[in-house]
Amino acid sequence: VELEQLLERAHSLGEEGNWELMADLLREHLSDFQDEPAVHCWLGVAEHELGLEGVAYERFKRAITLEPEDPYVLATAGNGIAAFDDEDAERVLRTAALTAPGLPLTRLMYGAYLSREGFHEQAQAELDAARALEPEDPQIAYELGVARALGGDIDGAADAVADSVQLDPEDGWARVVFGLLLLEVGRGDEMVGELISGARIRETDVDAQLGAALAAASTRRDEVAYEMLERARLNASEADLVLVADVEDRLDSAEASLQMLSEDLGPDLLRTRLQERP
C-alpha cells in the first residue's frame, strides 16, 4: 500500500468515528512507514480517541522527533503533547502557525494552547486570525470563547460560544459551557435551556446531568430535574455519589438549587471545562 492511500483510508475511518479500525489499519502498516511522521501522528489521534492517552503521547512524540514539515502533523502532534504539559508543545505549535499562517488549524491549535497557558492577548490574536480564515468553524468560535473567558471577558466569551452552538447545535460540550457562561453573566432563563439541551446530548456526562438537574429545579421543572438526577446516578462512579446526593438534597427548593448551581457546582464546572484542551 502506498503512503497516500494509507493516510486517505485512515482519515476516512476517522471522519466516520471508526477509531478502532483506523488504529488497527495504521498499526498494521507501521513497520512499513517507521520514518513517516504522519503515520505516527494519525495513529496517535486514533489511540487518543480510544482512551489510550499514554500510548498516543508516545506516537505524537515520535512524529515530532521525525521532524515533520506538514503543518497538519505539526499542529496535531503539538496539541497532542500539550495535554501532557510537554515543554516542546509551544515550539511545535508556534512553528506550525508561523510556517502555515493561512491554515486555520495551525492558528486554532496555537491559540488554544496559548489561552490555557495564560497568554490571553496572544491567544485571542491567533484565534481571531483563525476565525477570519474559517468563520463557519464551530471549534474556532468555541476556542475564541474559551480564550475570552480565561482572559476575564465573560460577556465576550458567551457571545463567541453562542456562535459555536449556532454553528453546531449537536455539540453537547459547547452547549453545557454556553449554559455555564450564561449563568455567570446573569442570563438565567437562557441558561436553563442550554444546560438541559447539553445534558441530553451528553447522556453519560455526570456533571452535565447534575448541572441540568439544578437548573431545572431552580425554575421548578421538577420532572426534568429528577430525570437528570437519575441519569447522573446511573452513570456515576463511586466517587461521584456524594455529589449526586448533595444535589438531590437541594432539588426540593428552587432557591437552594440555584444557590448550589451559582456558587458551587457551576463555577467549578466552568473552570475545569475551560481548561480542557481540544
Predicted segments with their positions:
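Structural signature of tandem alpha-helical TPR/SEL1-like repeats
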Residues: 16-24, 50-62, 81-95, 117-129, ...
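A conserved position within tetratricopeptide repeats
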Residues: 30-31, 64, 97, 131, ...
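Canonical tetratricopeptide repeat
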Residues: 42, 76-77, 109, 143, ...
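TPR/TPR-like (Sel1-like) alpha-helical repeat modules
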Residues: 200-206, 210, 214-240
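Terminal, low-structured helical/coil segments at or just beyond the last alpha-helical repeat
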Residues: 235-278
